[in-house]
């Protein structure tokens, strides 16, 4: 029951405040740990494809497990003091694990410009949430780009964290964010990360399989009805 209230409270906090720039975010510290492990393991392990894959596998073990154990220990500590403190820390971390407010704001900006039939403004609005050139998009193209991007980001920014929260509270949600952050930093198919990022990328694929499949299915249904 406490997990339910932690998730609900976290969702409300995210809807109201989003991610204030002045507030330290766990993902920032996760990124620092990933960078440290990347540098350190490359120095220690053989500079071969196999050595790099081992380094990536070690990173893919240390960060998620460490995140879960550390956040779980902090939650346990606060619950031992009083259940209210435990609930509050879980609510806070649940809110930080979500990215719903920013996603809703940006997608609504696109919708408003489309409603006004202002194509240049709609292109500009959608350019803030997609990673490709939008200058040549039609009204239909802008709509499809927005739906596809919202579906993709809803999967790893809302649906997956919520699912993790309901199963394992804030510690599991933060663990998911750690996996997602690893993929964002290491999951490139270039010379530097093709081997080191292999296991982190596979782990992210596994963690996202159910939530992303669901959101892509819903997005496909939406696009078919346009």
PLM region descriptions:
Residues 2-76:
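N-terminal transmembrane signal-anchor/hairpin module of polytopic inner-membrane proteins
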Residues 10-19, 175-207:
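Acidic (Asp/Glu-rich) catalytic motifs at the cytosolic membrane interface
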Residues 14, 215-222:
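Conserved small/polar residues in nucleotide/adenosyl-binding loops
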Residues 97-99, 158-176, 210-217:
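Hydrophobic, aromatic-rich membrane-embedded alpha-helical segments
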Residues 102-170, 181-191, 198, 221:
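Polar-ligand-bearing catalytic/cofactor-coordination segments
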């Amino acid at each position: 029951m406490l997990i339910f209230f932690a998730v609900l409270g976290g969702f409300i906090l995210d809807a109201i405040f989003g991610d204030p720039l002045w507030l330290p975010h766990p993902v920032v510290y996760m990124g620092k740990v990933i960078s440290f492990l990347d540098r350190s393991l490359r120095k220690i392990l053989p500079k071969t494809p196999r050595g790099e894959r081992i380094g990536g596998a070690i990173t893919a073990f240390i960060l998620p497990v460490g995140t879960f154990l550390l956040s779980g220990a902090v939650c346990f500590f606060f619950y031992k003091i009083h259940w209210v403190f435990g609930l509050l820390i879980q609510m806070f971390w649940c809110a930080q694990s979500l990215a719903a407010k920013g996603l809703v704001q940006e997608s609504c900006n696109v919708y408003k410009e489309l409603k006004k039939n202002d194509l240049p403004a709609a292109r500009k609005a959608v350019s803030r949430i997609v990673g490709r050139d939008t200058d040549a998009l039609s009204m239909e193209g802008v709509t499809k780009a927005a739906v596809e991007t919202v579906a993709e980001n809803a999967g790893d920014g809302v649906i997956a964290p919520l699912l993790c929260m309901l199963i394992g509270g804030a510690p599991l949600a933060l663990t998911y964010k750690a996996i997602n952050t690893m993929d964002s930093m290491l999951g490139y198919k270039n010379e530097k990360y093709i081997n080191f990022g292999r296991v982190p990328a596979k782990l992210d694929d596994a963690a996202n399989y159910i939530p992303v499949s669901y959101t892509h299915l819903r997005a496909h249904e939406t696009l078919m009805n346009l």
